[in-house]
Curated annotation (Swiss-Prot):
This is Propanediol uptake facilitator PduF. A motif (NPA 1) lies at residues 66-68. A motif (NPA 2) lies at residues 201-203. Disruption phenotype: No visible phenotype, not required for BMC formation. Reduced levels of PocR protein; pocR is transcribed in part from the pduF promoters. Belongs to the MIP/aquaporin (TC 1.A.8) family. It comes from Salmonella typhimurium (strain LT2 / SGSC1412 / ATCC 700720). The keyword Iron-sulfur does not apply. One of its GO terms (cellular component) is plasma membrane. Induction: By propanediol aerobically and anaerobically, under control of PocR, Arc and Crp. Has 2 promoters. Gene3D superfamilies: Glycerol uptake facilitator protein. It is found in: Cell inner membrane. The chain crosses the membrane at residues 10-30, 42-62, 84-104, 143-163, 179-199, 228-248. PROSITE patterns: MIP.
Amino acid sequence: MNDSLKAQCGAEFLGTGLFLFFGIGCLSALKVAGASLGLWEICIIWGLGISLAVYLTAGISGGHLNPAVTIALWLFACFPKQKVLPYIIAQFAGAFGGALLAYVLYSSLFTEFETAHHMVRGSVESLQLASIFSTYPAAALNVWQAALVEVVITSILMGMIMALTDDGNGIPKGPLAPLLIGILVAVIGASTGPLTGFAMNPARDFGPKLFTWLAGWGNMAMSGGREIPYFIVPIVAPVIGACAGAAIYRYFIGKNLPCNRCEL
């Protein structure tokens, strides 16, 4: 791995960890510290966290911060194949690190909450706290319905990311693109968050899930109490959705724009 790629992976690690730290910190404040936050406020914090992370990293790595985005850009926007796996590893590691850091700062409040509510980690009831770190679907949704939600919202996310970063599509977005992407995430979260927690990012979900598995929630963290282990859904569905969104943008919008594009 050359020095340039190391720097890019380092940026992906830091950026992914940063927005996870903000998002998990927000949910920790809500659930174990008694903060008063509504759905829109939570979504805005997640969205602005992503915007700030992209601003931090875009000049070095492009600010992917999401394996689904990296894979879609490789398949549909000429991102170099040799960078895909290192980026993804850095993103998963960053997500784990962001979850760990947020937990360290709030650990005493987690312990106090569990003691006060007689909550045992690894029980179904403990998913209430595990959901601070990663996503689980609403009880009324089965695994396949949750997967469909994640495919749809990630396809919207990816299609809009390509539109917002494509200077050939209307007015150049330039420095506004990260902010607009953050607003996009907040809007998606506000409209569909109660269904699945709007993961849209395998690293954002599995990195913290791995942390909770190690931190005492065990298999319950991975399965979500479902017969089909739920951790699979936020890994696979966002990749499918991102590729679908990129393909739709590429073939219905991008190919009709007056600019040069790489050939598949």
